[in-house]
Amino acid sequence: MMNTLNIDFQKTALVIIDLQKGIVPIDQSGQVVPNAKKLVDEFRKHNGFISFVNVAFHDGADALKPQTDEPAQGGSGEMPADWAEFVPEIGVQDGDYTVTKRQWGAFFGTDLDLQLRRRGIDTIVLCGIATNIGVESTAREAFQLGYQQIFITDAMSTFSDEEHEATLRFIFPRIGKSRTTEEFLEQVK
């Protein structure tokens, strides 16, 4: 049985990870952006804080280049000029708070934690791409920083069902609550 969500939109932020032109094509279901947009609309309705997060690099020299057994998916080389732009369907508006991260997690090397704390936010609703990379890294950082978390499972995706399910089954239950978009929207009415 799921615990009821007691959402105070003045203390809760929606954090959307990497819904940008170069990453959204990973979502084979096609449901991540529409579901995230429903969340954006709900947060806007309640004047809730939304953080749109993307990943970008200045010139490539600032990107990590670890020696690994499995190269990063997506290959290497120069990214298209619009690779880091948010997809227009998500509805980023002038004046919205955006974060550009240089690593997997949205907290490391950014002012996201500072901005959330200054607004009195203690809970984040998290969605985006990729479940087991940018989203999970952000979730782990948020957990270590003491935030309560709600993961919107059908507003996130990754390279394979196996990777997605591993995070949903083994990581998220230890650090927060998981809901679908409709479950979340129903519970905040």
Swiss-Prot record:
InterPro entries in alphabetical order: Isochorismatase (IPR016291), Isochorismatase-like_dom (IPR000868), Isochorismatase-like_hydrls (IPR050272), Isochorismatase-like_sf (IPR036380)
UniProt keyword Hydrolase present: yes
Gene Ontology molecular function: isochorismatase activity
Keywords: Hydrolase
Record-linked SUPFAM superfamilies: Isochorismatase-like hydrolases (SSF52499)
Enzyme Commission code(s) on record: 3.-.-.-
Pfam families: Isochorismatase
Family note: Belongs to the isochorismatase family.
PANTHER family documented for this protein: ISOCHORISMATASE FAMILY PROTEIN YECD (PTHR43540:SF7), PEROXYUREIDOACRYLATE/UREIDOACRYLATE AMIDOHYDROLASE-RELATED (PTHR43540)
Full protein name: Uncharacterized isochorismatase family protein YwoC
Origin organism lineage: Bacteria, Bacillati, Bacillota, Bacilli, Bacillales
Gene from which this protein is expressed: ywoC
